[in-house]
UniProtKB/Swiss-Prot annotation:
GO cellular component, one term: plasma membrane
Descriptive protein name: Osmosensitive cation channel TMEM63C
Extracellular side of membrane: 1-35, 158-180, 432-446, 518-540, 613-615, 677-681
Transmembrane stretches, start-end: 36-60, 125-157, 181-205, 402-431, 447-476, 481-517, 541-573, 594-612, 616-640, 648-676, 682-702
Phosphoserine: residues bearing it: S75, S78
Organism expressing this protein natively: Mus musculus (Mouse)
Outcome, altering F543A: Increases calcium influx induced by hypo-osmotic stress
Keywords linked to the UniProt accession: Calcium, Cell membrane, Endoplasmic reticulum, Ion channel, Ion transport, Membrane, Phosphoprotein, Transmembrane, Transmembrane helix, Transport
Length: 802
């Protein structure tokens, strides 16, 4: 196909503009230099304001006394913006860092000068992998700035398609004539960017070895076991007969413990309240409280529901009631057995042999039989390596088969329609235009209206969407936390890329247009016009403004943590007593959400890579975002979040997504070549070939990486014991939390027996109050409970992965 002359390029460009965007649309109207200078200045001003505001709040909340801050300080700013001293004991915080952190803005400079070693010692090995990943992206984008600004940008600018008045448009690929040989540079660099990125991700993977602790255990998880089997000896007998020499050391049955876990949480909460008010009553006398959830919002004492009651008696009676309900449910749990068991064997080779025997059972292969085969029905079993006990979400094990898949499909179908069709910012603003809401401002033609507001709106949706995905993952009821986190990583990234990059880029700016594009066969005949929307200069400016907003306003708001503030305020206003508020404060020490942060960062990285060739000015702003994101994450990981231990598969998922990002740039170049120079042009053929080669290389690299890891684990394991695989006779010192039994079933009466409750003694008994030392000891144990649980869990899981 012959190339169009420059006049045809200009005519086609004008037709595309009129077709992609309505004349009154406030989304991507043409502005001087795309409105980028205005958006940049506004974001700098807002970033400075947010940082100064955060510095003030942080200084006002500064307190080195951890216990005083947690128990006695009711300051809202202290509870939200307090330092890591809220989450760790003073011995875990560097005294030198505290001494250097006394100035108004010293926290900012400390984040810049903080050594990686200090961050890793404080936050663990996952933090090291995360910041190393950021280092690779920063260096990669820094290298991309050289050809993007030094070669591609001048080539675009010297083009002759657009007028000299089109300042921003002249920096894009639209300004390059279809007859120009310089278009070869764009295709070559798009392929080169992919290869460089692949090399950087390969180098990053050398820095850590993904490990699955489940391959180092000698425990198998077996499903579809008949629930009528109550005797573990039947399971042991089957394995002894079917696999001679096999020694079963332990068999754990699983039960439906959803209600039991909820009751246990409630009675523990009541116990905390009783301990707190018993100790307080000894010092200050009887304490009266309001028990209605909205009592903090209403000061009226005339209503019955807002009457004050004796706090100690209220929590004592509540604890007694919940303990009775718990014990009754505990007796019923034995009748709620699930068709799932955990079987631990003596040696790892036996585990490998049994696992291989059941690996292909779904393909019609029959496993070995025994004299009890008709009872255990092992031909229906599904066998897998058992995850770490601390990784299992026990209350979700009862949701299986049809119910689980129905729930999963329904939730994700709803999210699909919500994010793809309804919440794209361009769709929302165009829908507003339909109802003439924007008519009063259509004559303003202000970059603040046409560029800054849509970019802020897009950023707001990219912040809200991962939160909804994160909450939906809990509704999906995954069996393990690792699978739940992996789902969050992949879903967030896929939804973000479609919502931010693909749909708006292709000009699908209204639900009506999308449905026509999807179903109207006559409308599809004009699909060429729609795909031209990818290469409009204003389209590139919109995404540059989005990257700028994410780099400045976005990172500033990550420091503020408004989500935590809103959550805290809601929970605080609905709390009924001081113990609940103490518990809420301690719960502010949440884990750093690596999956969510990976998705946010890689979404912006994908935007940069998609437009790095067609709109090269976006690359330095992408570098700005990565640097600002890195500094913000360093601060948040060190000061604001609790240490986190993850399955390394999450880090590998981020690597795969980063490898995918440059493919968007290759897709965009292929679309441009097909639409502008024809499907049989040599540049189009080269773009298609490079895209196919890149896809093959990417998938081959992912496949070979997974195969290499799988082969490593296929090798015979060393006879290394894990703490939950040892013989029963040697588990006297084994923590019960490391057994394949739900925690609530291990020692359900620990520290919560009805005999320890004052409610059991005060009615008709004398001298039944616990000793003061006992109460204070219980209160101290309550204060330590949340502090150590998360970090200890991370240490246990880390120990299993080595």
């Amino acid at each position: 196909m012959s190339a169009f002359p420059d006049s045809m390029d200009q005519k086609f460009h004008n037709m595309t503009v009129n077709e992609c965007f309505q004349s009154r649309s406030t989304v991507l109207q043409g502005q001087p230099f795309g409105g980028i200078p205005t958006v940049l200045v506004l974001n700098i001003i807002l970033w400075v304001f947010v940082v100064l505001l955060y510095s003030f709040l942080r200084k006002a909340a500064w307190d080195y006394g951890r216990l005083a801050l947690l128990i006695h300080n009711d300051s809202l700013t202290s509870l939200i913006y307090g330092e890591q001293s809220e989450k760790s004991s003073p011995s875990e915080v560097s005294l030198e860092a505290e001494r250097r952190d006394r100035g108004f803005s010293s926290w900012f400079f400390n984040s810049l000068t903080m050594r990686d070693r200090d961050l890793i010692n404080k936050c663990g090995d996952d933090a090291r992998i995360y910041i190393t990943f950021q280092y690779h992206l920063i260096i990669f984008v820094l290298i991309l700035c050289i050809p993007s600004l030094g070669i591609i940008l001048p080539v675009n600018y010297i083009g002759t398609v657009l007028d000299w008045n089109s300042h921003f448009g002249r920096t894009t690929i639209v300004n390059v004539s279809t007859e120009s040989k310089f278009l070869w540079l764009h295709s070559l660099f798009a392929f080169l960017y992919f290869l460089i990125n692949l090399a950087f991700m390969g180098h990053h993977c050398l820095g850590f070895v993904p490990k699955k602790s489940l391959h180092f255990t000698r425990t198998l998880m077996i499903t579809y076991v008949p629930t009528e089997i109550q005797d573990p000896e039947i399971i042991s007998k089957h394995f002894h007969e079917a696999y001679p020499g096999c020694v079963v050391t332990r068999v754990h049955f699983c039960y439906d413990v959803r209600n039991l876990i909820d009751l246990d949480d409630q009675r523990r909460h009541a116990m905390r309240g009783r301990l707190y008010y018993t100790a307080k009553a000894k010092k200050t006398g009887k304490v009266m409280i309001k028990t209605h959830p909205c009592s903090r919002l209403c000061f009226c004492k005339c209503w019955t529901c807002f009457k004050e009651v004796d706090a100690e008696q209220y929590y004592s009676e509540l604890e007694e009631q919940l303990t009775d309900e718990f014990n009754a449910e505990l007796n019923r749990v034995q009748l709620k057995r699930l068709d799932l068991i955990f079987v631990t064997f003596q040696d790892a080779r036996t585990v490998r042999r049994i696992y291989d025997d059941y690996k292909y059972i779904h393909c019609g292969r029959h496993p070995k039989q025994s004299s009890v085969t008709t009872i255990v029905k092992n031909y229906h079993w599904r066998v897998a390596h058992a995850p770490h006990p601390k990784d299992i979400i026990w209350k979700h094990l009862s949701i299986r088969r049809f119910s689980w898949w129905t729930r999963f499909i329904a939730i994700n179908t709803f999210l699909f329609f919500l994010f793809f069709f309804l919440t794209t910012p361009a769709i929302i603003i165009n829908t507003i235009d339909i109802y003439n809401v924007t008519r009063p401002i259509e004559k303003l033609q202000s970059p603040i209206v046409t560029q800054f507001f849509p970019s802020v709106l897009l950023w707001a949706f990219t912040v809200t969407m991962p939160l909804l995905v994160y909450l939906s993952a809990f509704l999906e009821a995954h069996w393990t936390r690792s699978s739940q986190n992996l789902i969050i990583v992949h879903k967030c990234y896929i939804f973000l890329v479609f919502m931010v990059v693909i749909l708006p880029s292709m000009g699908l700016t209204s639900l009506h247009v999308f449905l026509r594009w999807l179903f109207d066969i006559y409308y599809l005949e004009h699909a060429t016009i729609r795909f031209q929307c990818v290469f409009l200069p204003d389209n590139g400016a919109f995404f540059i403004n989005y990257v700028i907003t994410a780099a400045l306003l976005g990172t500033g708001m990550e420091l503020m943590r408004l989500g935590s503030l809103c959550t805290y305020c809601t929970r605080l206003f609905l709390s009924k007593s001081e113990p609940e508020r103490v518990h809420i404060r301690k719960n502010q020490a949440t884990d750093f959400q690596f999956g969510r942060e990976y998705a946010w960062m890689l979404n912006v990285f994908s935007v940069v890579m998609a437009y790095s060739i067609t709109c090269p000015i976006i690359v330095p702003f992408g570098l700005l975002y990565l640097c600002m994101k890195h500094i913000t994450d360093r601060y948040n990981m060190y000061y604001s979040y609790a240490p986190t231990k993850l399955n390394a598969q999450i880090h590998m998922a981020a690597v795969y997504q980063a490898i995918f990002a440059p493919l968007l740039g290759l897709f965009w170049m292929l679309f441009f070549s097909i639409l502008r120079v024809g499907s049989l042009h040599s540049i189009t053929l080269f773009s298609m070939s490079s895209l196919i080669i890149s896809v093959v290389i990417a998938f081959s690299g992912v496949f070979l990486g997974k195969l290499r890891i799988a082969q490593r684990y296929e090798q015979p394991e060393e006879e290394t014991e894990t703490v939950f695989d040892v013989e029963p006779s040697s588990t006297t010192s084994t923590p019960t939390s490391l057994l394949y039994v739900a925690t609530v079933l291990q020692e359900p009466e620990l520290n919560l027996t009805p005999a320890s409750s004052p409610a059991r003694h005060t009615y008709g008994t004398i001298n039944s109050q616990p000793e003061e030392g006992e109460e204070e000891s219980g209160l101290r144990g309550f204060a330590r409970e949340l502090d150590s649980a998360q970090f200890q869990e991370g240490l246990e899981m880390e120990g299993q992965s080595h």
